[in-house]
Design a protein with these regions (language model features):
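P-loop (Walker A) phosphate-binding loop of NTP-binding proteins
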Residues: 8
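ATP-dependent small-molecule kinase phosphotransfer cores
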Residues: 30-79, 84-91, 116, 125, ...
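A glycine- and Lys/Arg-enriched "phosphate-lid" helix/loop adjacent to the NTP-binding pocket
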Residues: 92-136
Length: 169
């Protein structure tokens, strides 16, 4: 059983994924962390040097490697759903949960984090709103389950996922 968590930056994918993995005794992985560990540089640096297109190529290669594993919880990068190939990989190898998160929550959570290349030197609220508009339908298309995270802690969201997995497999 593989559980894949998608959603925008600031939705809590990594936090929720770690809790779900612990509850279900599965290994936890994060695509962004894997990319940083394999390259030895930050996502921010990759964006600066290779641009978003270069990063997306690395992201797809990493996803191919990760979906070949079994019994994992995988937190993905916010833009993983942009590529149709990625959406197909996710759908074919596990159950996909979309963490639907209100814009104000994303703004609040990402305001403390300076390692968000897409927000660098921009108005974060406008960028996040634009990303939400362009990606929301892709998240929905890619997902088996949509989890509303509004006014919920990471533990509450994780518990919803665990219940769904236990009830529906």
């Amino acid at each position: 059983m593989n559980i894949f968590i998608v959603g925008p930056m600031g939705s809590g994918k990594t936090t929720v994924g770690k809790i779900v993995a612990g509850e279900l005794f599965l290994d936890f992985h994060d695509t962004d962390e894997k990319i940083e560990n394999s390259t030895g540089v930050t996502i921010d640096w990759i964006f600066d040097i290779e641009g978003e297109a270069g990063f997306r190529k690395r992201e797809t290669a990493t996803l191919k490697e990760m979906v070949a594993m079994n019994s994992i919880v995988l937190a993905t990068g916010g833009g993983i759903v942009i590529e149709e190939e990625n959406r197909e990989l996710l759908a074919s190898r596990g159950t996909v949960f979309y963490l639907h998160t209100p814009l104000n929550t994303q703004v609040e959570r990402t305001s403390k984090d300076k390692d968000r290349p897409l927000l660098k030197g921009q108005d974060p609220e406008k960028v996040l709103a634009d990303l939400q508009k362009s990606r929301q339908s892709l998240y929905e298309e890619a997902s088996d389950h949509i989890i509303n995270t509004e006014n919920k802690s990471g533990s509450e969201v994780a518990n919803e996922i665990v219940k769904l997995v236990k009830n529906y497999g």
